[in-house]
């Protein structure tokens, strides 16, 4: 998938700069005082930002488009475009593009239940 230049999340700290094309960004998970960025090709990049700081960067840089990225609990930010399967009972969330990436993540029943309800509401509002 081709990404336009403006559709990039810039993460800059000290002498380090990371450019992540948004269409390739599947999820970001907390890892102690760091965050791990996971892209469609399975590449994981550890950055010296806490998840809350990454969340703030997303909101600052993307504005209204930041709604595609959802914070799930304390340890996860997902790109909602990749939501493929939610199983509340098994506490499982699958993020996939239906082709080259497949990630199974765990989340609480409460978080997944809210996510499922939100997606259903979004879907129903789009039909109207």
What are these regions, as identified by a protein language model?
Residues 2-128:
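Basic, polyanion-interacting recognition surfaces, primarily
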């Amino acid at each position: 998938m081709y990404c336009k230049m403006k559709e990039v999340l810039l993460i800059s700290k000290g002498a380090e700069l990371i450019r992540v094309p948004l269409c390739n960004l599947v999820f970001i998970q907390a890892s102690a005082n760091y965050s791990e960025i996971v892209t469609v090709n399975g590449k994981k990049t550890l950055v010296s930002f806490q998840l809350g700081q990454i969340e703030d960067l997303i909101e600052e840089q993307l504005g209204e488009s930041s709604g595609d990225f959802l914070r799930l609990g304390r340890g996860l930010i997902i790109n909602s475009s990749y939501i493929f399967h939610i199983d509340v009972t098994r506490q499982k969330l699958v993020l996939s593009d239906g082709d080259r990436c497949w990630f199974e993540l765990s989340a609480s029943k409460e978080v997944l239940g809210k996510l499922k309800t939100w997606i259903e509401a979004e879907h129903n509002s789009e039909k109207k």
